[in-house]
Every structure is written in structure tokens, then in C-alpha cells.
Amino acid sequence: SLLEFGMMILEE
């Protein structure tokens, strides 16, 4: 999902 993608970016 879009939210999951955003969280992935923040983790980096």
C-alpha cells in the first residue's frame, strides 16, 4: 500500500 511505501522510505 501507499502507506507501507512511505514507511519504507522513512526507514532508510
UniProtKB/Swiss-Prot annotation:
Function: PLA2 catalyzes the calcium-dependent hydrolysis of the 2-acyl groups in 3-sn-phosphoglycerides.
Tissue and organ expression note: Expressed by the venom gland.
Localization of this protein: Secreted
Catalytic reaction equation(s): a 1,2-diacyl-sn-glycero-3-phosphocholine + H2O = a 1-acyl-sn-glycero-3-phosphocholine + a fatty acid + H(+)
Keyword list, A-Z: Calcium, Hydrolase, Lipid degradation, Lipid metabolism, Secreted
One GO-annotated biological process of the protein: lipid catabolic process
Homology family: Belongs to the phospholipase A2 family. Group II subfamily.
Source species: Vipera berus (Common European adder)
Record text on cofactor binding: Binds 1 Ca(2+) ion.
Origin: domain of life: Eukaryota
EC number, as in UniProt: 3.1.1.4
Cofactors demanded by this protein: Ca(2+)
Protein name: Basic phospholipase A2
Main localization, broad class: secreted
Gene Ontology terms for molecular function: phospholipase A2 activity
Gene Ontology CC: one annotated term: extracellular region
